[in-house]
Amino acid sequence: MNRTVSIVIPTFNRARLLPRAIDSALAQTVPVEVVVCDHGSTDDTPQVARSYGERIRYLRRDQDRGPIVCWRDGVEQASGELIHFNYDDDWIEPQFVARTAPLLRDDVGFVYTRARIHEPGSEATRVMLRHPPGTRPMAQIVQFLLRDKLTVSPGCALFRRRDVLKNLLPEVPGARGVYGKNSGVGEDLLLFLLAALDYPRYAHVPEALSHFLAHPTSITTQAGSSGNMGVLADAYAVAKQYYLQQPGSMAPAQGLAGWWAKTRWKLASRT
């Protein structure tokens, strides 16, 4: 079954990086729709996007209302049944859609690939998400997501459009601080965890088909350089707490029970 795929590229003031993201989407070995959603860029982003003409759909909004609103706007305007988020500072291999889309069967909630991290000014890279390959029980990835301090990025994943519209929340309920307030931190994790409530399996492609650039303006890099990684982890902990409050959620495995009790106490002490 051939299903249409929309690659949504949310962007804000990254005219210099944007062409690589767009070019990688257009270079897919199967037909895709490319939607570039720009909320309030004040640099040359509009000129860069419009230079692609009818090869992409360019959505321009004058007001910046934050990443999540931009993500959702792009998905709402997309026509594909399947959605991939290709963030403006990242890029994907030409085979990304061809390798992931066939695995998104009826019982599979999402598909993700390994990702290669690139450091600016360095040829050295590292590969993350070296997980077991193939289609596997959803409980395996849920336990990883509950245990790990960070998460799997939507930038290396493929979802159903209907699931993104259902699970991409405006903000993580109960989140506090700079992260979790329409920043994409926590909301990205819930795309996976909330999808896990509706499907018994997920799929992983053991190839680094996604590329992430670690640069000074990325949220993770900014948090690390400013000593705010703890705040970042707290935002993800709030997302996990929200997931565990949902009917049908999978409780942490025995080895995680103590960790989760400490995490809940830590979050409660900050309210």
Model regions and ranges:
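Conserved nucleotide-sugar donor-binding catalytic segment
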Residues: 134-225
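Glycine-rich, basic loop-to-helix element that forms the pyrophosphate-binding segment
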Residues: 61-78
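Acidic helix N-cap motif at the loop->helix transition within catalytic regions
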Residues: 16-19, 43-51, 91, 95
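A conserved acidic beta->alpha catalytic loop
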Residues: 24, 38-47, 63, 87
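Short, acidic, metal-binding catalytic loop of nucleotide-sugar glycosyltransferases
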Residues: 23-32
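Short aromatic/hydrophobic "clamp" motif used to bind/position activated sugar donors
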Residues: 83
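Conserved donor NDP-sugar-binding/catalytic core segment of glycosyltransferases
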Residues: 95-127
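N-proximal low-complexity "stem/linker" segments adjacent to membrane-targeting elements
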Residues: 1-24
